[in-house]
């Protein structure tokens, strides 16, 4: 990466009549392997390098990017971003919350460097997983295992004196399996992800995880019974807690969405200026605290500084059942009279940084998983989900269980076929009356923006109980 060229672009931007300028360079080595039913279906290996310029001038914001690494191109980018900013000026001028410049370097270390693992070994290890799945008595005719890897070097500078260098290896795995029993199919999808080296792949124990999923799907087909519709206690596994935290807390708390910036693409939020919900409004039981924390070590959503040069920290979104803090970039922070909390990310050099979640999860309580289930006289345990949807205000939502069981007198009984809960954000979080001590995470890819930016995140939390909710 030519950091001198990036610095040159910033110096040239400073020669313009600007309020603010920044440059951001990315160099990403990308590799992806796909195994489909025992065959290597795809192997991709690329290197993508480029940089972008963003300029604030006369209350307008301009952005330009390129993968051409020349001084002429740097000047062209600056001129283009500057012209865009001038043309975009409006009565309601854009401003950025004040921040001090930062000069630092940070990187994620690898115990087993991904660069040192030959492609042949990676393919062989994925093939071993597929072989283990195909050699079972359970019929698993559909098996897709994918392993995407990104090694990303970044360099960020701005007109306030920031110069931040970083290196992050991200390794992920996606698995789709289809189990067929007596002509009836059931499917499961699992995603794994870490900011780490190849040691993460070793630690996931994907074979056992996927075999467990296959056994559960088979049992659901054989023994799963429909739910008797009605109000009941619902115990949710960590996967369900995580998706609910992400969808009904994380997204509606994004400040750009709150201000209407996402309205034409993904909708808005039930939280908005002048509406019934705002900071300080109760949204759940006082035992409910949901945070978004980029600093969880080795997490899929890990970073130390965001893509506007702001130091990462834990953000309290719902605190003690109260709407507490929005996810901000510098623009939304200025608009709402506060400071950025380091929530601005871009997935590549040709994408503008926007407000994003990192690792969104419910904080632990003081119960054990066993105690929660033993305390239920009659209910449902929805350990994982197979589908979900939520409206464009992130208020009305629906979750369908994958691995689920009836609870009778504190014991798990027969499996339940696709139990459904349809509820609202406030009802969901107000119904929580027990939270486990143990937090678990699942990797996910959060979609947002136009052009789309799929950002690596964790969802998660403990096992929870929702008291007397309608399940069908």
Model region roles, listed by residue range:
Residues 1-472:
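N-terminal small-residue-enriched
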């Amino acid at each position: 990466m030519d950091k001198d060229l990036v610095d040159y672009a910033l110096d040239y931007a400073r020669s313009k009549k600007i309020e603010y300028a920044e440059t951001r360079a990315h160099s990403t080595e990308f590799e992806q392997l796909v195994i489909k039913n025992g065959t290597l279906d795809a192997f991709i290996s690329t290197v993508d390098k480029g940089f972008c310029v963003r300029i604030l001038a006369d209350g307008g914001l301009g952005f330009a990017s390129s993968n051409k690494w020349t001084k002429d191109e740097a000047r062209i980018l600056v001129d283009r971003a500057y012209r865009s900013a001038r043309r975009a000026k409006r009565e309601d001028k854009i401003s950025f919350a004040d921040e001090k410049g930062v000069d630092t370097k940070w990187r994620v270390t690898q115990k087993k460097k991904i660069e040192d693992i030959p492609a042949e070994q990676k393919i062989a290890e994925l093939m071993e997983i597929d072989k283990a799945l195909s050699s079972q008595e359970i019929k698993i005719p559909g098996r897709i295992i994918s392993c995407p890897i990104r090694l990303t070097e970044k360099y960020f500078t701005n007109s306030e004196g920031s110069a931040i260098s970083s290196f992050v290896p991200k390794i992920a795995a996606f698995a789709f399996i289809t189990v067929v029993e007596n002509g009836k199919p059931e499917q499961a999808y699992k995603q794994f992800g870490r900011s780490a080296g190849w040691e993460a792949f070793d630690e996931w124990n994907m074979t056992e995880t996927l075999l467990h999923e296959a056994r559960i799907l088979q049992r659901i087909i054989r023994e799963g019974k429909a739910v008797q519709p009605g109000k009941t206690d619902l115990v949710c596994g960590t996967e369900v807690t995580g998706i609910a935290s992400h969808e009904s807390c994380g997204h509606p708390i994004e400040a750009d969405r709150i201000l209407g910036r996402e309205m034409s693409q993904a909708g808005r939020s039930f939280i908005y200026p002048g509406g019934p919900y705002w900071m300080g409004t109760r949204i759940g039981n006082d035992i409910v605290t949901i945070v978004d924390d980029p600093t969880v070590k080795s997490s899929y959503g890990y970073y130390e500084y965001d893509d506007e040069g702001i130091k990462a920290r834990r953000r309290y979104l719902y605190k003690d059942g109260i709407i507490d803090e929005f996810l901000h970039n510098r623009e939304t922070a200025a608009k709402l009279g506060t400071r950025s909390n380091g929530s601005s990310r871009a997935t590549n050099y040709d994408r503008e940084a926007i407000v994003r979640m990192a690792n969104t999860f419910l904080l632990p309580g003081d119960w054990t998983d066993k105690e929660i289930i033993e305390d239920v006289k009659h209910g449902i345990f929805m350990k994982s989900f197979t589908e979900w949807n939520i409206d464009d205000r992130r208020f009305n939502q629906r979750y369908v269980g994958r691995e689920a069981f009836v609870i009778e007198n504190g014991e798990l009984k027969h499996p339940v076929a696709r139990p459904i809960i349809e509820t609202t954000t406030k009802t969901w979080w107000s119904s929580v009356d027990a939270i486990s001590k143990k937090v678990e995470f699942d990797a996910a890819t959060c979609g947002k923006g136009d052009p789309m930016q799929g950002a690596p995140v964790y969802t998660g939390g403990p096992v929870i109980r929702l008291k007397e909710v309608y399940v069908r």
